[in-house]
Protein backbone atom coordinates (compact mmCIF):
# COMPACT_ATOMS: atom_id res chain seq x y z
CA UNK A 1 0.00 0.00 0.00
CA UNK A 2 1.29 3.41 -0.95
CA UNK A 3 0.66 6.15 1.63
CA UNK A 4 0.84 9.78 0.52
CA UNK A 5 0.33 13.11 2.22
CA UNK A 6 -1.56 15.82 0.36
CA UNK A 7 -2.75 19.30 1.24
CA UNK A 8 -5.93 21.01 0.09
CA UNK A 9 -5.89 21.75 -3.66
CA UNK A 10 -3.25 19.08 -4.33
CA UNK A 11 -3.88 15.92 -6.29
CA UNK A 12 -2.68 12.41 -7.04
CA UNK A 13 -2.55 10.80 -10.48
CA UNK A 14 -3.18 7.09 -10.95
CA UNK A 15 -2.03 5.91 -14.33
CA UNK A 16 -2.79 8.57 -16.93
CA UNK A 17 -6.57 8.60 -16.62
CA UNK A 18 -7.44 8.86 -12.91
CA UNK A 19 -6.91 11.93 -10.75
CA UNK A 20 -7.78 12.29 -7.07
CA UNK A 21 -7.91 15.87 -5.81
CA UNK A 22 -8.10 17.06 -2.21
CA UNK A 23 -10.77 19.76 -2.16
CA UNK A 24 -11.17 20.54 1.51
CA UNK A 25 -9.78 19.40 4.85
CA UNK A 26 -11.87 19.87 7.98
CA UNK A 27 -11.41 18.77 11.55
CA UNK A 28 -12.53 15.16 11.04
CA UNK A 29 -13.12 14.80 7.30
CA UNK A 30 -11.48 15.25 3.93
CA UNK A 31 -13.47 16.14 0.81
CA UNK A 32 -12.02 14.60 -2.34
CA UNK A 33 -12.86 14.68 -6.04
CA UNK A 34 -12.16 11.77 -8.34
CA UNK A 35 -11.82 12.16 -12.11
CA UNK A 36 -11.93 8.81 -13.88
CA UNK A 37 -13.32 7.27 -17.05
CA UNK A 38 -17.00 6.29 -16.88
CA UNK A 39 -16.13 2.59 -17.07
CA UNK A 40 -14.26 2.80 -13.74
CA UNK A 41 -16.60 2.06 -10.83
CA UNK A 42 -16.02 4.31 -7.83
CA UNK A 43 -17.79 3.41 -4.60
CA UNK A 44 -17.38 4.26 -0.95
CA UNK A 45 -16.05 1.14 0.78
CA UNK A 46 -19.10 0.80 3.06
CA UNK A 47 -21.39 0.85 -0.01
CA UNK A 48 -19.16 -1.68 -1.78
CA UNK A 49 -19.37 -3.98 1.27
CA UNK A 50 -23.19 -3.76 1.31
CA UNK A 51 -23.37 -4.58 -2.41
CA UNK A 52 -20.97 -7.50 -1.93
CA UNK A 53 -23.09 -8.94 0.90
CA UNK A 54 -26.31 -8.54 -1.10
CA UNK A 55 -24.69 -10.30 -4.06
CA UNK A 56 -23.66 -13.19 -1.79
CA UNK A 57 -27.25 -13.48 -0.51
CA UNK A 58 -28.54 -13.42 -4.07
CA UNK A 59 -26.16 -16.17 -5.15
CA UNK A 60 -27.24 -18.35 -2.21
CA UNK A 61 -30.90 -17.70 -3.04
CA UNK A 62 -30.25 -18.57 -6.70
CA UNK A 63 -28.61 -21.85 -5.65
CA UNK A 64 -31.65 -22.70 -3.52
CA UNK A 65 -34.00 -21.86 -6.38
CA UNK A 66 -32.00 -23.93 -8.84
CA UNK A 67 -32.18 -26.88 -6.44
CA UNK A 68 -35.98 -26.45 -6.13
CA UNK A 69 -36.39 -26.22 -9.90
CA UNK A 70 -34.28 -29.35 -10.37
CA UNK A 71 -36.43 -31.21 -7.84
CA UNK A 72 -39.59 -30.14 -9.68
CA UNK A 73 -38.08 -31.16 -12.99
CA UNK A 74 -37.09 -34.55 -11.56
CA UNK A 75 -40.56 -35.01 -10.05
CA UNK A 76 -42.37 -34.39 -13.34
CA UNK A 77 -39.95 -36.48 -15.37
CA UNK A 78 -40.35 -39.71 -13.39
From Swiss-Prot:
Keyword Transmembrane attached: no
The UniProt entry, under Gene3D superfamilies, shows: Translational regulator CsrA
Compartment(s) where it occurs, according to its Swiss-Prot or TrEMBL record:
Cytoplasm
**UniProt keyword annotations, A-Z:** Bacterial flagellum biogenesis, Cytoplasm, Repressor, RNA-binding, Translation regulation
- Extract the SUPFAM superfamilies matched here: CsrA-like
Disulphide bridges: none
A single GO molecular-function term is: mRNA 5'-UTR binding
Cellular component (GO) terms are: cytosol
Statement: the UniProt record of this protein carries the keyword Cytoplasm:
yes
General function of this protein: A translational regulator that binds mRNA to regulate translation initiation and/or mRNA stability. Usually binds in the 5'-UTR at or near the Shine-Dalgarno sequence preventing ribosome-binding, thus repressing translation. Its main target seems to be the major flagellin gene, while its function is anatagonized by FliW.
* HAMAP family in the cross-refs: CsrA
Q: Which PANTHER family match?
A: CARBON STORAGE REGULATOR
Q: Which family does it belong to?
A: Belongs to the CsrA/RsmA family.
Task: Describe its partners and assembly state.
Answer: Homodimer; the beta-strands of each monomer intercalate to form a hydrophobic core, while the alpha-helices form wings that extend away from the core.
- Cited NCBIfam families: csrA (TIGR00202), PRK01712.1 (NF002469)
**Protein name, as recorded:** Translational regulator CsrA
Q: What would be the name of the gene that encodes this protein?
A: csrA
Amino acid sequence: MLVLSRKANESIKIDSNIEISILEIKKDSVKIAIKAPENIKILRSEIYDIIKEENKKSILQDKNNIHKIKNLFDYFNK
